[in-house]
Curated annotation (Swiss-Prot):
A GO term for molecular function: RNA binding
InterPro entries in the cross-refs: Alba-like_dom_sf (IPR036882), Pop7/Rpp20 (IPR014612)
Pfam families per the UniProt record, alphabetical: Rpp20
Protein name per UniProt: Ribonuclease P protein subunit p20
Alphabetical GO biological process terms: rRNA processing; tRNA 5'-leader removal; tRNA processing
Purpose: Component of ribonuclease P, a ribonucleoprotein complex that generates mature tRNA molecules by cleaving their 5'-ends. Also a component of the MRP ribonuclease complex, which cleaves pre-rRNA sequences.
Taxonomic classification: Eukaryota, Metazoa, Chordata, Craniata, Vertebrata
Native species: Homo sapiens (Human)
Amino acid sequence: MAENREPRGAVEAELDPVEYTLRKRLPSRLPRRPNDIYVNMKTDFKAQLARCQKLLDGGARGQNACSEIYIHGLGLAINRAINIALQLQAGSFGSLQVAANTSTVELVDELEPETDTREPLTRIRNNSAIHIRVFRVTPK
């Protein structure tokens, strides 16, 4: 028999939007490192690309250059994360390589009742994620 992984008060069917308000929680993140870039769809593409390039180049003064960065994308931002990594690689004239890993992330949604007679509910859903390592290679 299939194991029920849903927490207490979990939702299995669609609920009436008049009865509940959907609140999507932020996904859990690992402790942030200086060379981690979390890509989203709200920030401008050129700004995210410039931030990645700045980390790889070491900023305006050339200090603290990272030999590798990790670009993380979740859901709709996967495409943008891939595009950023490919733009970095294309602009590096062969000095950068990329390695991608995919995963599935569990996200938790909270359903808050509109009336006091109902209990708050939670819903777990899965979303795809990508983690791209962009790193420098030594020329041969």
